[in-house]
Protein backbone atom coordinates (compact mmCIF):
# COMPACT_ATOMS: atom_id res chain seq x y z
CA UNK A 1 0.00 0.00 0.00
CA UNK A 2 1.55 3.39 -0.94
CA UNK A 3 2.63 5.96 1.63
CA UNK A 4 -0.19 8.37 0.88
CA UNK A 5 -2.80 5.76 1.81
CA UNK A 6 -5.24 7.37 4.22
CA UNK A 7 -5.06 4.40 6.59
CA UNK A 8 -1.31 4.56 6.97
CA UNK A 9 -1.12 8.34 7.17
CA UNK A 10 -3.78 8.38 9.86
CA UNK A 11 -1.88 5.74 11.85
CA UNK A 12 1.37 7.71 11.74
CA UNK A 13 -0.46 10.95 12.52
CA UNK A 14 -2.26 9.42 15.49
CA UNK A 15 0.97 7.93 16.86
CA UNK A 16 2.67 11.33 16.73
CA UNK A 17 -0.29 12.94 18.48
CA UNK A 18 0.05 10.36 21.26
CA UNK A 19 3.73 11.28 21.53
CA UNK A 20 2.76 14.97 21.68
CA UNK A 21 0.23 14.27 24.44
CA UNK A 22 2.90 12.46 26.45
CA UNK A 23 5.28 15.38 25.96
CA UNK A 24 2.56 17.71 27.29
CA UNK A 25 2.24 15.50 30.38
CA UNK A 26 6.03 15.52 30.68
CA UNK A 27 6.10 19.32 30.69
CA UNK A 28 3.42 19.51 33.39
CA UNK A 29 5.15 16.89 35.56
CA UNK A 30 8.45 18.66 34.99
CA UNK A 31 6.85 21.89 36.15
CA UNK A 32 5.53 20.16 39.25
CA UNK A 33 8.98 18.76 39.91
CA UNK A 34 10.47 22.25 39.72
CA UNK A 35 7.78 23.94 41.81
CA UNK A 36 7.97 21.31 44.57
CA UNK A 37 11.79 21.51 44.62
CA UNK A 38 11.97 17.81 43.75
CA UNK A 39 14.47 17.98 40.90
CA UNK A 40 17.61 17.33 42.94
CA UNK A 41 16.21 14.38 44.90
CA UNK A 42 17.90 11.88 42.55
CA UNK A 43 21.58 12.72 42.36
CA UNK A 44 22.68 10.10 39.83
CA UNK A 45 21.92 9.53 36.17
CA UNK A 46 21.19 5.89 35.49
CA UNK A 47 19.22 5.68 32.22
CA UNK A 48 18.57 1.93 32.54
CA UNK A 49 18.88 0.81 36.16
CA UNK A 50 17.31 4.06 37.38
CA UNK A 51 13.96 2.80 36.14
CA UNK A 52 13.77 0.63 39.27
CA UNK A 53 12.86 2.71 42.34
CA UNK A 54 14.03 1.94 45.89
CA UNK A 55 12.44 -1.34 46.97
CA UNK A 56 13.57 -1.67 50.57
CA UNK A 57 14.06 0.54 53.59
CA UNK A 58 17.82 0.32 53.08
CA UNK A 59 17.43 1.44 49.46
CA UNK A 60 15.51 4.49 50.63
CA UNK A 61 18.14 5.26 53.27
CA UNK A 62 20.86 5.04 50.62
CA UNK A 63 19.02 7.43 48.28
CA UNK A 64 18.36 9.83 51.14
CA UNK A 65 22.03 9.75 52.11
CA UNK A 66 22.99 10.82 48.59
CA UNK A 67 20.52 13.70 48.71
CA UNK A 68 21.84 14.76 52.12
CA UNK A 69 25.17 15.53 50.45
CA UNK A 70 23.62 18.26 48.29
CA UNK A 71 23.82 21.94 49.11
CA UNK A 72 20.04 22.15 48.80
CA UNK A 73 19.58 19.70 51.67
CA UNK A 74 22.34 21.14 53.86
CA UNK A 75 21.22 24.77 53.53
CA UNK A 76 17.48 24.58 52.86
CA UNK A 77 16.13 21.15 53.84
CA UNK A 78 18.31 19.95 56.71
CA UNK A 79 15.24 19.13 58.82
CA UNK A 80 13.68 16.96 56.09
CA UNK A 81 12.49 13.51 57.16
CA UNK A 82 12.69 10.33 55.12
CA UNK A 83 8.95 10.47 54.44
CA UNK A 84 9.28 14.01 53.11
CA UNK A 85 12.20 12.91 50.95
CA UNK A 86 10.12 10.10 49.48
CA UNK A 87 7.53 12.65 48.35
CA UNK A 88 10.01 14.69 46.30
CA UNK A 89 11.80 11.54 45.11
CA UNK A 90 8.65 10.16 43.52
CA UNK A 91 8.08 13.36 41.52
CA UNK A 92 11.58 13.29 40.06
CA UNK A 93 11.48 9.53 39.48
CA UNK A 94 8.09 9.86 37.76
CA UNK A 95 9.45 12.63 35.55
CA UNK A 96 12.37 10.47 34.46
CA UNK A 97 10.19 7.38 34.09
CA UNK A 98 7.82 9.22 31.80
CA UNK A 99 10.82 10.21 29.72
CA UNK A 100 11.71 6.53 29.33
CA UNK A 101 8.10 5.75 28.37
CA UNK A 102 8.11 8.48 25.73
CA UNK A 103 11.30 7.00 24.31
CA UNK A 104 9.65 3.59 23.96
CA UNK A 105 6.38 4.96 22.60
CA UNK A 106 8.38 6.85 19.99
CA UNK A 107 11.06 4.33 19.05
CA UNK A 108 9.02 1.12 18.66
CA UNK A 109 6.31 2.50 16.32
CA UNK A 110 8.96 4.50 14.45
CA UNK A 111 10.85 1.32 13.61
CA UNK A 112 7.59 -0.47 12.76
CA UNK A 113 6.35 2.25 10.41
CA UNK A 114 9.78 2.52 8.80
CA UNK A 115 10.09 -1.24 8.21
CA UNK A 116 6.54 -1.49 6.84
CA UNK A 117 7.09 1.34 4.39
CA UNK A 118 4.56 3.69 5.95
CA UNK A 119 6.94 6.67 5.92
CA UNK A 120 7.98 8.82 3.00
CA UNK A 121 11.67 9.65 2.61
CA UNK A 122 10.85 13.17 3.79
CA UNK A 123 9.19 11.94 6.99
CA UNK A 124 11.92 9.36 7.64
CA UNK A 125 14.61 12.02 7.86
CA UNK A 126 12.46 14.35 9.93
CA UNK A 127 11.32 11.69 12.37
CA UNK A 128 14.85 10.38 12.77
CA UNK A 129 15.96 13.91 13.61
CA UNK A 130 13.15 14.14 16.16
CA UNK A 131 14.36 10.88 17.70
CA UNK A 132 17.84 12.38 18.08
CA UNK A 133 16.36 15.47 19.73
CA UNK A 134 14.59 13.23 22.23
CA UNK A 135 17.88 11.56 23.13
CA UNK A 136 19.56 14.95 23.47
CA UNK A 137 16.74 16.08 25.76
CA UNK A 138 17.55 13.31 28.23
CA UNK A 139 21.18 14.45 28.32
CA UNK A 140 20.11 18.08 28.71
CA UNK A 141 17.92 17.07 31.64
CA UNK A 142 20.85 15.52 33.47
CA UNK A 143 23.07 18.48 32.53
CA UNK A 144 20.46 20.70 34.17
CA UNK A 145 20.24 18.56 37.33
CA UNK A 146 24.04 18.41 37.60
CA UNK A 147 24.15 22.21 37.84
CA UNK A 148 22.30 21.98 41.16
CA UNK A 149 24.59 19.36 42.66
CA UNK A 150 27.48 21.74 43.27
CA UNK A 151 27.23 24.76 45.54
CA UNK A 152 23.86 25.96 44.23
CA UNK A 153 20.49 25.70 45.95
CA UNK A 154 18.68 25.26 42.63
CA UNK A 155 19.51 24.25 39.09
CA UNK A 156 20.84 26.83 36.66
CA UNK A 157 18.06 28.93 35.16
CA UNK A 158 19.94 28.87 31.85
CA UNK A 159 19.92 25.08 31.77
CA UNK A 160 16.31 24.96 32.93
CA UNK A 161 15.32 27.25 30.07
CA UNK A 162 17.27 25.08 27.63
CA UNK A 163 15.53 21.95 28.92
CA UNK A 164 12.06 23.49 28.71
CA UNK A 165 12.79 25.04 25.33
CA UNK A 166 13.83 21.67 23.92
CA UNK A 167 10.63 20.11 25.29
CA UNK A 168 8.54 22.65 23.40
CA UNK A 169 10.60 22.16 20.23
CA UNK A 170 9.91 18.42 20.44
CA UNK A 171 6.22 19.10 21.11
CA UNK A 172 5.93 21.49 18.19
CA UNK A 173 7.69 19.17 15.75
CA UNK A 174 5.58 16.20 16.86
CA UNK A 175 2.40 18.13 16.07
CA UNK A 176 3.79 19.52 12.82
CA UNK A 177 4.87 16.09 11.57
CA UNK A 178 1.55 14.62 12.67
CA UNK A 179 -0.28 17.14 10.50
CA UNK A 180 2.08 16.43 7.62
CA UNK A 181 1.55 12.68 7.96
CA UNK A 182 -2.21 13.15 7.79
CA UNK A 183 -2.44 15.81 5.09
CA UNK A 184 0.85 15.60 3.21
CA UNK A 185 3.67 18.18 3.06
CA UNK A 186 2.77 21.85 2.60
CA UNK A 187 2.90 23.31 -0.92
CA UNK A 188 6.01 25.08 -2.13
CA UNK A 189 4.07 28.32 -2.35
CA UNK A 190 3.39 29.70 1.10
CA UNK A 191 0.19 31.34 2.21
CA UNK A 192 0.03 35.12 2.54
CA UNK A 193 0.07 35.02 6.33
CA UNK A 194 2.67 32.25 6.68
CA UNK A 195 5.53 34.56 7.64
CA UNK A 196 3.42 36.57 10.09
CA UNK A 197 2.14 33.41 11.76
CA UNK A 198 5.64 31.96 12.05
CA UNK A 199 6.86 35.19 13.62
CA UNK A 200 4.06 35.13 16.18
CA UNK A 201 4.85 31.50 16.98
CA UNK A 202 8.47 32.54 17.57
CA UNK A 203 7.34 35.29 19.93
CA UNK A 204 5.21 32.83 21.92
CA UNK A 205 8.24 30.55 22.18
CA UNK A 206 10.38 33.42 23.49
CA UNK A 207 7.71 34.17 26.11
CA UNK A 208 7.78 30.53 27.22
CA UNK A 209 11.57 30.71 27.62
CA UNK A 210 11.21 33.88 29.68
CA UNK A 211 8.72 32.01 31.85
CA UNK A 212 11.37 29.35 32.41
CA UNK A 213 13.73 32.04 33.71
CA UNK A 214 11.01 33.29 36.06
CA UNK A 215 10.53 29.76 37.38
CA UNK A 216 14.25 29.06 37.60
CA UNK A 217 14.89 32.16 39.69
CA UNK A 218 11.64 31.95 41.70
CA UNK A 219 11.09 35.46 40.36
CA UNK A 220 7.32 35.13 40.68
CA UNK A 221 7.60 35.37 44.47
CA UNK A 222 8.46 39.07 44.41
CA UNK A 223 6.63 42.12 43.05
CA UNK A 224 3.31 40.41 43.66
CA UNK A 225 1.26 43.37 42.48
CA UNK A 226 -0.39 44.22 39.18
CA UNK A 227 -0.45 46.12 36.88
CA UNK A 228 2.56 47.91 38.36
CA UNK A 229 5.51 46.27 40.09
CA UNK A 230 5.22 47.56 43.66
CA UNK A 231 4.02 50.87 42.27
CA UNK A 232 6.63 51.18 39.52
CA UNK A 233 6.45 50.62 35.78
CA UNK A 234 10.15 49.70 35.81
CA UNK A 235 10.99 48.23 39.22
CA UNK A 236 13.57 49.97 41.36
CA UNK A 237 15.74 46.86 41.57
CA UNK A 238 15.67 46.21 37.82
CA UNK A 239 19.40 45.57 37.39
CA UNK A 240 19.91 44.15 40.86
CA UNK A 241 23.37 45.73 41.10
CA UNK A 242 24.58 43.90 37.99
CA UNK A 243 25.63 44.98 34.52
CA UNK A 244 22.86 44.98 31.93
CA UNK A 245 23.76 41.76 30.13
CA UNK A 246 23.76 39.33 33.05
CA UNK A 247 20.95 41.29 34.73
CA UNK A 248 18.43 40.58 31.97
CA UNK A 249 18.82 36.86 32.74
CA UNK A 250 19.79 36.91 36.42
CA UNK A 251 18.01 39.84 38.08
CA UNK A 252 14.70 38.68 39.54
CA UNK A 253 13.09 42.05 38.85
CA UNK A 254 14.31 42.21 35.25
CA UNK A 255 13.28 38.65 34.43
CA UNK A 256 9.77 39.16 35.80
CA UNK A 257 9.37 42.51 34.05
CA UNK A 258 10.43 41.06 30.70
CA UNK A 259 7.99 38.17 31.12
CA UNK A 260 5.17 40.63 31.87
CA UNK A 261 5.87 42.93 28.94
CA UNK A 262 6.49 40.16 26.44
CA UNK A 263 3.12 38.74 27.48
CA UNK A 264 1.49 42.06 26.60
CA UNK A 265 3.37 42.03 23.28
CA UNK A 266 2.09 38.51 22.55
CA UNK A 267 -1.47 39.67 23.29
CA UNK A 268 -1.09 42.67 21.00
CA UNK A 269 0.33 40.45 18.27
CA UNK A 270 -2.44 37.89 18.61
CA UNK A 271 -5.23 40.47 18.38
CA UNK A 272 -3.56 42.13 15.38
CA UNK A 273 -3.22 38.70 13.80
CA UNK A 274 -6.89 37.90 14.46
CA UNK A 275 -7.83 41.11 12.67
CA UNK A 276 -5.68 40.09 9.69
CA UNK A 277 -7.29 36.65 9.64
CA UNK A 278 -10.73 38.27 9.73
CA UNK A 279 -9.80 40.14 6.54
CA UNK A 280 -8.39 36.97 4.93
CA UNK A 281 -10.79 35.61 2.27
CA UNK A 282 -9.85 31.96 2.78
CA UNK A 283 -11.60 30.13 5.59
CA UNK A 284 -8.92 27.67 6.80
CA UNK A 285 -7.44 30.16 9.27
CA UNK A 286 -10.78 31.55 10.50
CA UNK A 287 -11.03 29.33 13.63
CA UNK A 288 -7.77 30.81 14.94
CA UNK A 289 -9.38 34.26 14.88
CA UNK A 290 -11.30 33.13 17.98
CA UNK A 291 -9.07 30.40 19.46
CA UNK A 292 -5.88 32.43 19.81
CA UNK A 293 -7.37 35.54 21.49
CA UNK A 294 -9.36 33.35 23.88
CA UNK A 295 -6.24 31.42 24.88
CA UNK A 296 -4.19 34.59 25.32
CA UNK A 297 -6.83 36.23 27.50
CA UNK A 298 -7.05 33.11 29.65
CA UNK A 299 -3.29 32.83 29.89
CA UNK A 300 -2.83 36.44 30.97
CA UNK A 301 -5.58 36.03 33.57
CA UNK A 302 -3.90 32.90 34.95
CA UNK A 303 -0.52 34.63 35.03
CA UNK A 304 -1.90 37.60 36.95
CA UNK A 305 -3.79 35.34 39.36
CA UNK A 306 -0.68 33.25 40.01
CA UNK A 307 1.41 36.37 40.60
CA UNK A 308 -1.05 37.98 43.02
CA UNK A 309 -1.39 34.71 44.96
CA UNK A 310 2.44 34.34 45.13
CA UNK A 311 2.60 31.42 42.68
CA UNK A 312 0.69 28.59 44.37
CA UNK A 313 1.23 25.21 42.76
CA UNK A 314 -2.26 24.90 41.25
CA UNK A 315 -2.30 28.28 39.53
CA UNK A 316 1.31 27.94 38.40
CA UNK A 317 0.59 24.60 36.73
CA UNK A 318 -2.59 25.99 35.17
CA UNK A 319 -0.50 28.85 33.76
CA UNK A 320 1.98 26.34 32.35
CA UNK A 321 -0.85 24.30 30.84
CA UNK A 322 -2.17 27.48 29.25
CA UNK A 323 1.23 28.05 27.67
CA UNK A 324 1.13 24.54 26.22
CA UNK A 325 -2.34 25.09 24.72
CA UNK A 326 -1.37 28.46 23.24
CA UNK A 327 1.81 27.01 21.76
CA UNK A 328 -0.06 24.07 20.21
CA UNK A 329 -2.64 26.43 18.72
CA UNK A 330 0.13 28.60 17.27
CA UNK A 331 1.86 25.56 15.73
CA UNK A 332 -1.44 24.51 14.15
CA UNK A 333 -2.01 28.05 12.88
CA UNK A 334 1.51 28.21 11.43
CA UNK A 335 1.02 24.90 9.65
CA UNK A 336 -2.38 25.95 8.32
CA UNK A 337 -1.06 29.32 7.14
CA UNK A 338 1.58 27.60 5.00
CA UNK A 339 -1.19 25.77 3.15
CA UNK A 340 -3.69 28.63 2.90
CA UNK A 341 -2.77 29.64 -0.65
Swiss-Prot record:
Pathway: Porphyrin-containing compound metabolism; heme A biosynthesis; heme A from heme O: step 1/1. GO terms for biological process: heme A biosynthetic process. One of its GO terms (molecular function) is metal ion binding. Its EC number is 1.17.99.9. Keywords: Cell membrane, Heme biosynthesis, Iron, Membrane, Metal-binding, Oxidoreductase, Transmembrane, Transmembrane helix. The chain crosses the membrane at residues 11-31, 101-121, 127-147, 160-180, 194-214, 261-278, 288-308, 315-335. GO terms for cellular component: plasma membrane. Heme binds at residues 259, 319. InterPro entries: COX15/CtaA_fam, HemeA_Synthase_type2. Its cofactor is heme b. It is found in: Cell membrane. Coiled coil: none annotated. It is a multi-pass membrane protein. Pfam families: COX15-CtaA. It comes from the Bacteria. Catalyzes the conversion of heme O to heme A by two successive hydroxylations of the methyl group at C8. The first hydroxylation forms heme I, the second hydroxylation results in an unstable dihydroxymethyl group, which spontaneously dehydrates, resulting in the formyl group of heme A. Interacts with CtaB. Belongs to the COX15/CtaA family. Type 2 subfamily. This is Heme A synthase. It comes from Maricaulis maris (strain MCS10) (Caulobacter maris). The gene is ctaA.
